[in-house]
């Protein structure tokens, strides 16, 4: 069995709920639809799909089954409009952009692994002006299986040219953590509004925010050593 390296050469970020809080808007947009139809959106089922896909729970299919009829296109379109409006009102979550920039300045490789579509992830990263802070982005369009399977993280590691054992994944959900760990990576969890009440204890460390967190801070959380490029200090300054 391979012994995992204590030397960290790469950070890989989740997207939804970690870089941008899209998870609460998606949940709230469906909650509004359920409430408008006099139905309850089961939270215990909803959390099964956080960080993954609707394979485990399809909110549209479930509601239509409860109602005994299909939702109208107008209802579906208005939900998308509400979700989009709420997502566009969100700012990058605290500390993410700064940590990604500091990691690259320190000579680390930096990537994104998301179960969402490439258009969704890259579109938002570009809109937020931070797409160029990442060396590689991999989405559901690039792999056979999304989280909690390891495919996404393995794909990003291959793209970055790093060993998964030399990589820290930064996640917000149980599905994401399971994916990173299955890929052989270390994992730091940063819970959000939706995942704050979930069990994230299978991560190597849990932090409440990335605000003010530097690359050395992150690796120290799990007792590792940061690989530092020649002529640069651990905080990313030349």
PLM features per residue range, with description:
Residues 1-9, 101, 118-238:
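Asp-based, Mg2+/Mn2+-dependent phosphohydrolase catalytic module
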Residues 4-106, 119:
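N-terminal helical cap/lid subdomain that shapes the substrate entry/recognition surface
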Residues 15, 109, 174:
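Short glycine/serine/threonine-biased micro-segments
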Residues 21, 90, 112, 166-168:
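Residue-level marker of alpha-helix boundaries and capping positions
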Residues 40, 109, 186:
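Residue-level detector of anion-binding/catalytic polar loops
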Residues 81-88, 108, 139-142, 161-162:
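A broad detector of the eukaryotic-type serine/threonine protein kinase catalytic domain
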Residues 111-112, 189:
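Hydrophobic beta-strand core positions in alpha/beta domains
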Residues 114-116:
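Conserved phosphate-coupling serine/threonine residues in phosphotransfer and NTP-handling enzymes
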């Amino acid at each position: 069995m391979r012994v995992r390296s204590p030397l960290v050469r790469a950070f890989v970020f989740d997207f939804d709920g970690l870089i941008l809080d899209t998870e609460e808007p998606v949940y709230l947009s469906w909650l509004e639809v359920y409430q408008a139809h006099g139905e309850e959106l089961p939270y215990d089922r909803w959390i099964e799909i956080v960080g993954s896909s609707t394979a485990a729970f399809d909110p549209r299919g479930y509601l239509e089954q409860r109602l005994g009829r299909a939702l109208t296109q107008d209802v579906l379109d208005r939900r998308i409009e509400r979700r989009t409006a709420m997502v566009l009102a969100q700012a990058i979550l605290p500390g993410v952009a700064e940590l990604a920039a500091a990691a690259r300045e320190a000579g680390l490789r930096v990537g994104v692994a998301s179960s969402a579509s490439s258009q969704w992830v890259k579109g938002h990263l570009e809109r937020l002006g931070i797409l160029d802070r990442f060396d590689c982005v991999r989405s559901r369009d690039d792999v056979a299986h999304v989280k909690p399977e390891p495919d996404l993280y393995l794909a990003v590691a291959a793209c970055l040219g790093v060993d998964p054992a030399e990589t820290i994944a930064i996640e917000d959900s149980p599905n994401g953590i399971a994916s990173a760990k299955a890929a052989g990576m270390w994992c730091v969890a940063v819970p959000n509004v939706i995942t704050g009440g979930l069990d994230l204890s299978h991560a190597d460390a849990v932090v409440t925010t990335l605000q003010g967190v530097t690359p050395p801070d992150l690796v120290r959380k799990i007792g590792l050593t940061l690989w530092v490029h020649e002529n640069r200090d651990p905080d990313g300054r030349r």
